[in-house]
A protein has these predicted regions:
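Bacterial Sec-dependent N-terminal signal peptides
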Residues: 2-7, 18-47, 51, 209, ...
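Aromatic-residue-lined binding/catalytic grooves and analogous aromatic/hydrophobic interfacial grooves
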Residues: 25, 234-272, 559, 564-566, ...
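Membrane-proximal, proline-rich intrinsically disordered regions
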Residues: 25-75, 324-331, 502-573
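Conserved, well-structured interaction surfaces
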Residues: 86-164, 196, 200-204, 213-225, ...
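Hydrophobic-face positions in mid-chain alpha helices that act as interaction patches
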Residues: 255-400, 433-467, 487, 493, ...
Length: 573
């Protein structure tokens, strides 16, 4: 942990910036401290260390997705309040109240942290331009030039997938509002980032991300890093490119970059090597920066673990049935079964890799479960007083997730057998000894089975997919999406899969002081799939996101209902 702390807790260049009101787009308008000059390759490299964000959208994405249930619904005797008010707002897909720097995991902290990283990357790029006429071909600067561009592309990639629609196609995504793509150092305040000069369509943002990836990816040199896992090393950069092209549906390129990351002999996680003695040992072994499977490690300020153990309101839990006020019976899928404690096509019971790795809330198993890697690190600022900061370690890119990206790309390229082979490599690395076959996949992901929690309603045609999978290929896709859900639980990736495939999500919820259960659904075209721009950013002039949805009336006309409206089909009549 010593190396990790040195690399991810020391913000080597944060004193370079005095954060000015970003119209209040805070981080977008950061100006350099005139007392500091970035005039050497070493200074540029150290500056880029501070460009990696200390926040993650994982908690917001998990709450928005179908990975969590409201325990007040599945355990009727409970009347739990959320750990934080905005957790309930996120679960109900409402606009989230404005929070500033005092609260972790909010839209504001994600927006601020990622745009701050973009500002740092831009300052590094600008400094290199002043140091060399051709930084990309300067042996002292080329590596940092590559890292800065790939990192800038990645930060915009996260922001556009959180605060904008999923990519559909080159035509339809031109009409979807994206985000501000910032490529310049701003030396003035009150810049209007809602101006088309900055705020681009989703399609334009993707084009600019691709430009940054291609500008930088071949220049990255792992030998320049002391600890590569905390930077965009070559494997991490190629894994990012694979995911980017998968989301853009350029499957040839997705396959190419996944192969670059994985190599001829993919080194997936060795779960048997994880020390089982204590929870802390498990987490330390999982996050070991020396493991070949850990492509990129990110430390954040987050209270996601505490949401699971201190509130037991929005949790991973078993499902069940209930009848609403209108007499309609609802089936609530078991999020426990489909994430960290359920069967698969070639294993029964719990996935072997997760055996002994799933923990329950101290109040009892009925109050939810969580996977060991969610456990937080605590950084003491005063050990005697017992105060400090909570950190969550995330791994944005791993070999295990990348091989699932490759399987999906292979499937769309017509190589179903190759996709199944990759899926079998994944199950094998997770301790499954039985072979994976198409017949087993078809049996597990049988869409004709009533209430099959392992399959989801997909709307690929509506989301712009040129190729819509059917039959056996669709079963393999269901398997891939299930494995992705298992692999990335707690990390928010399920939300992005929901967005890109138009997966329908149903949330049932009951307030702490309520007896009535509310039900709401999120269809493929519901604008609430886009998180609202933070209110303080909107107040400063950045346009808010339209999150209203048309509702058909009996006469065939329609009205717009605010996105915060919750349809209550279970009201008394």
């Amino acid at each position: 942990m010593k190396d990790m702390n040195r690399n991810i807790y020391s913000l080597l260049a944060i004193s370079l910036f005095s954060i000015v009101a970003m119209c209040s787009c805070t981080a977008l308008d950061e100006a350099p401290d005139n007392r500091t000059e970035i005039d050497t390759a070493d200074k540029v490299s150290k500056l880029l260390t501070s460009a990696y964000p200390l926040s993650s959208p994982a908690l917001l994405c998990e709450l928005s997705s179908d990975n969590l249930v409201d325990d007040n619904v599945v355990v009727p005797a409970t009347h739990n309040s959320p750990y934080a008010i905005f957790h309930e707002q996120a679960y109900k897909w409402e606009d989230i109240d404005n929070y500033s720097t005092g609260e972790d995991d909010t839209p504001y902290t994600v927006w601020e942290s990622y745009y701050q990283g973009i500002a740092v990357a831009n300052h590094a790029i600008d400094a290199m331009r002043q140091m060399s006429e051709d930084p990309a071909n300067d042996p002292e600067l080329a590596h940092s030039w590559g890292e800065a561009h790939v990192l800038r592309g990645y930060l915009h990639f996260v922001l556009v997938n959180v605060f904008a629609e999923a990519y559909k196609d080159e035509t339809r995504s031109l009409s979807d509002n994206g985000i501000a793509y910032v490529r310049e150092v701003e030396n003035t305040v009150n810049v209007n980032y809602g101006d088309p000069k900055y705020r681009k369509s989703v399609a334009e943002v993707y084009d600019l991300i691709e430009r940054d990836i291609l500008e930088g990816i071949d220049l990255i040199d792992d030998s320049k890093y002391q600890v590569p896992a905390y930077h965009f090393n070559r494997n991490a950069a190629n894994a990012f490119a694979a995911r980017f092209y998968l989301f853009k549906r350029d499957y040839e390129q997705a396959l190419k970059y996944a192969n670059n990351a994985l190599g001829a002999n993919p080194q997936l996680r060795n779960w048997k090597a994880i020390n089982q003695n204590t929870l802390e040992m498990k987490v330390n072994d999982y996050n070991d920066e020396k493991l070949a499977c850990n492509y990129l490690i990110q430390s954040t300020y987050s209270r996601q673990w505490r949401m699971h153990v201190s509130s037991a309101r929005f949790v991973i839990n078993e499902g069940g049935k209930f009848t609403d006020w209108n007499g309609k019976e609802w089936h609530i899928p078991s999020t426990l079964d489909v994430t960290c404690f359920g069967s698969g096509p070639n294993w029964s019971g719990v996935l072997p890799a997760y055996s002994g790795m799933v923990y329950v809330n101290g109040a009892g198993q009925e109050y939810g479960a969580w996977l060991f890697r969610l456990y937080e690190y605590f950084e003491y600022t005063d050990k005697i007083a017992g105060i400090g900061y909570v950190h969550q370690i995330y791994q944005p890119f791993t070999a295990d997730e990348t091989i699932l990206c490759r399987a999906e790309a292979k499937l769309y390229l017509g190589d179903r057998d190759g996709a199944i082979k990759d899926l079998e490599l994944w199950t094998g690395s997770h301790g499954v000894e039985d072979p994976l076959t198409l017949d087993k996949i078809k049996t597990k992901y049988n869409r004709a089975k009533v209430n099959n929690d392992w399959v989801s309603e997909l709307y690929p045609a509506e989301m712009g997919f040129e190729k819509v999978l059917t039959g056996d290929d669709l079963s393999v896709l269901d398997c891939i999406l299930h494995f992705r859900r298992v692999e990335t639980v707690h990390e928010g990736q399920r939300w992005f899969d929901i967005k890109r495939y138009g997966i329908k999500v149903i949330h049932h919820y009951r307030g702490a002081n309520e007896d009535e259960i509310h039900t709401d659904s999120l269809t493929w075209n519901d604008p609430r799939r886009v998180l609202q721009i933070p209110q303080n950013v909107v107040d400063a002039g950045y346009p808010s996101t339209e999150r209203t949805r048309p509702v058909k009336l009996q006469d065939g006309s329609s009205i717009k209902v605010p996105g915060v409206y919750q349809p209550k089909g279970n009201n008394k009549k």
